[in-house]
């Protein structure tokens, strides 16, 4: 029979499905039988077991509530336990009735439950009576305690009055003795002893007796009544009698009447003891009932256990029946499984293996040989299977196609070889072009670096010389000319920096460094506008700021780059505005911080507005500029994650808007010190080959108090370090005639690890250079640099303190030394040591005795003496001590430190004079 593979597989699957259906029907019948047996048993067993469990739980809860009822100490708890007992009793009766309906004998359990209920009702009534008694006890006890306290208070008042009278009598006795009236004095003394003091003792005894009664009543308890009731009653009786006797001796009739009235309440102690006695009897009765309840509950639990045993016996019979049905089903399923397995094996061998699997395996082997390259391999017999006949015909066609493909592949291989040779030639040409581009880029970078160095070096000479000349008082008449030289030099430096920034941006922005640090936006904007205010002098232009209140106090960003962009925008506004105003605004807009520069200048043509951010584009060539400012500002805004936009109306004005991400700073903003920094006594080594740069730098540092040794090459620097005293730091130029500055720095770092190295160069200092030299230099100072900035950077890198943090006012001491000489300062210091220092001991003594006026006088004298000798920090502490003599810190240590610093300064001056 010539059947297809599909029909043969369908026939095998149909037989397996029929076998599966038969097994399922037999298994379903067995499971249905087991389920019916289980249902018949569980419908009766499970509810019965649940009722038995609930009965046990209810009896346990009833016992628990009975125990809590006995210990109930308030009406709320008493009622709650009573309700619980009622609920559990009703639940037990309902369960017993349900079990009786199912054929169980519950007569004994019901009788036991009735007895327990009667006992619990009696127990509840006794607890209620006990609560009422305890309420009465509490009220009466409080009344007696309050009455005793009132008696004690009245007795204390009488005792105080008697003591006052005795004091007056005693004072009179002294007067009589002074007047020499001896007989009258003796009579008064007898009255004092026999009457006044005796009355004081009696009233004190009355007060103590009242307090004793009060304490005895407060300490009364059920346990004491049960143990020693007669003794307590006798003690209270004696104490009350004492109160009654002392009440009669009270002289004040009103007080005596009050005490008598209060004693009536105290005398009710016998009623209080009777209440405690009744409470004790009820507690004993309750204890007896509780013991009886435990015995009854034990009997009840025994009856319930017997009932549970009966229920479990019935359940065991039902489970045995269920196990027999389950075993019958298991044997049936096992037999069915064995028969099904044999039938399945027969179907798989006869239908699947002989008719499908084996012919397919032979055909697959033939196909594998064909795939391995044996194209002419013969195919096996198809065993009358239509699909295999079709595969044979297809493989013959495949042989023909393979031969044709082989021929076509040979042709393609020849074409690929030719194309590969052409591609290799193109790759070689591309590499050559790339190498030429890299050489051009390197040449451009080298040109910019050389240009920067060659321009910055003479520019440093121009700006430095102008600054030094401006400090010369003899050249005040030429100050405007020097200012013009400085402004021109700074403008040239700005143009150079713009060209370098544009070059870095054009190279892809890799060398454009953008920091991320906390800064204060308001001072940044105000100081930037203040710097531009000098350019509007004599011009009809008004500069204004408008900073919104929603601008945070501190933000995160690059304040230097932000200042650069805003300065560029303000410069453009000043360049294109002849009159009117320029407003610097700042506000927030959602998650952005906006800085706007709006002017009333000539405006920009809308057709050119889109081009102004392109390099070397100028609105008007008459206004000057390089045409790079807006390009650099726009690219810097993008580097900081923001954007720069502009709107303008011709003849009305323009508005440039800088948008930056609004990121509020969480870290504190570091405070910058803008005051002059003194470098007194600091030895510095300047390694610089340019003579003009040497001279200007040395003069700048000398004016700050530093001692500078200038060296022109690396060899002299090494020789100087070896033969001279140690230096605090070395300023190293990068371009030296004999050795590269970075190479020299590596050698100095190895030979003199304690020497601080600071870069001092006119090169382009980009992020790459900083990272490459960060392990060698504490920092890099770019040339040109103003004198104040040079001192501040050196102080920062050397971690020096500002001038105000020094103990001495060096400028004052220098002036005094020039006017009167150091010998006079030596004399002042000796007088200070002889006369002023002992004032410190006086301050210590006055502080110990809390004499603030003496401390103020001594602190005032010390403040004047310290101020005369230039001891600034010590003088400040003395002024603070004068204002707060008892709480301000003492100036002892600071004065000692200032004296030592002054002696060192004088010794240094003496050595310099020699």
UniProtKB/Swiss-Prot annotation:
One cellular-component annotation, GO: plasma membrane
Q: Which residues carry this modification: 4-aspartylphosphate?
A: 733
Give the chief site where it resides. Answer: membrane
| Reaction(s) catalysed (UniProt annotation) | ATP + protein L-histidine = ADP + protein N-phospho-L-histidine
Gene Ontology MF terms in the entry: ATP binding; phosphorelay sensor kinase activity
Q: Which residues are annotated with the PTM Phosphohistidine? A: 453, 860
The protein's name in its UniProt record:
Sensor protein TorS
Q: Which organism is it from?
A: Escherichia coli O157:H7
Recall the taxonomic lineage recorded for the source organism.
Bacteria, Pseudomonadati, Pseudomonadota, Gammaproteobacteria, Enterobacterales
